């Protein structure tokens, strides 16, 4: 009997539990033993591994976070640590490992694949910053969370005639700010991929004021930085009271949206099928609305392309 293990690593993302459920149930349906590794690579290093069954994944498809947990593990970044982790997997009789996470998690999976462990990577991160796939599990739920917050901030901004800077996650990738900003009608979208032009921001605010606009929403990806500096510049140049709202880790939680659940279920099912067919050391992706695979090393090295087309649309419609 084959044995497959599941590990979640890095920042949690809504949809991880739906993916865990899909992997576990596909394994059980096909007569494969399934093991859960608690607390990511740290749990692997400590042998924190248990056998899962149908009840282990009952009533989790709608839950955010990860029932397996996640934790940092500096030891696993070393060559000795990786060899130790591989040996622990072998000691537990594990034939294949499915890793749910982002770039760092995939680098760990790639390292294990090079020392004889069959691995499959599934992209789970709200940042949508993995270049080899169009979308990552958790991204659209985070966008929904941010869009809901923007709707509430629009109400209070209009009541008081204010501008509001909404800082969202995205150190190197501004997709959360871009997608939620376009979907919510933000006047300005500030992302790390585009150089900040404060005059453009303030000119939009002033044009809006002249035609009686009461609110001004500015989306800011955290990678741009300087939320309070931008606030001060806006107030100095326009005289408009400006508030800063940092959404923080609320973006990672909550019930996963339908799209994330569907993608997670499809990817989890495919991961098991690939291991059954001995097609491993791969990463699963969504490209052009299709679920595909690429070599895991390619997934780690592919650079993210910015959605210039969507950014240009945002500029045209936020006059």
From Swiss-Prot:
Role of this protein: Catalyzes the phosphorylation of D-fructose 6-phosphate to fructose 1,6-bisphosphate by ATP, the first committing step of glycolysis.
Protein name listed in UniProt? ATP-dependent 6-phosphofructokinase
Q: How does it assemble?
A: Homotetramer.
Organism field? Finegoldia magna (strain ATCC 29328 / DSM 20472 / WAL 2508)
Where ADP binds, per the record, is at 21-25, 154, 185-187, 211, 213-215
Q: What is any one of the record's Gene Ontology cellular component terms?
A: 6-phosphofructokinase complex
Q: What is its main location?
A: cytoplasm
Q: What is the lineage of its organism?
A: Bacteria, Bacillati, Bacillota, Tissierellia, Tissierellales
Judging by the UniProt lineage, the source's domain of life is Bacteria
């Amino acid at each position: 009997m084959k044995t497959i293990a599941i590990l979640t690593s890095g920042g949690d993302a809504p949809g991880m539990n739906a993916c865990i459920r899909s992997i576990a149930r596909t394994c059980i349906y096909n007569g494969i033993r399934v093991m859960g590794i608690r607390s990511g690579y740290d749990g692997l290093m400590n042998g924190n591994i248990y056998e899962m069954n149908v009840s282990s994944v009952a009533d989790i498809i709608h839950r955010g976070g990860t029932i397996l947990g996640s934790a940092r593990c500096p030891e696993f970044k070393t060559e000795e640590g990786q060899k130790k982790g591989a040996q622990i997997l072998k000691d537990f009789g594990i034939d294949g490992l499915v890793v749910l996470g982002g770039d760092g998690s995939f680098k760990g999976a790639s390292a294990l694949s090079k020392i004889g462990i069959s691995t499959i990577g599934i992209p789970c991160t709200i940042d949508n910053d993995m270049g080899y796939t169009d979308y990552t599990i958790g991204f659209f739920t985070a966008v929904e969370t941010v869009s809901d917050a923007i709707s509430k901030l629009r109400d209070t901004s209009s009541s008081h005639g204010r501008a509001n800077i909404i800082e969202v996650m995205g150190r190197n990738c501004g997709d959360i700010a871009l997608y939620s900003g376009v979907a919510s009608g933000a006047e300005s979208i500030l992302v790390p991929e585009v150089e900040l032009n404060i005059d453009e921001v303030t000119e939009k605010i002033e044009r809006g004021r002249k035609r009686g606009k009461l609110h001004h929403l500015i989306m800011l990806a955290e990678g741009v930085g300087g939320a309070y500096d931008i606030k001060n510049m806006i107030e100095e140049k326009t005289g408009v009271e400006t508030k800063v709202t940092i959404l923080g880790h609320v973006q990672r939680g909550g019930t996963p949206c339908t799209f994330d659940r569907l993608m997670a279920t499809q990817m989890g099912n495919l991961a098991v099928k690939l291991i059954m067919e001995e097609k491993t050391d791969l990463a699963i992706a969504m490209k052009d609305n299709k679920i595909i695979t690429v070599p895991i090393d390619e997934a780690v090295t592919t650079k993210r392309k910015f959605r210039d087309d969507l950014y240009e649309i945002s500029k045209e419609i936020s006059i």
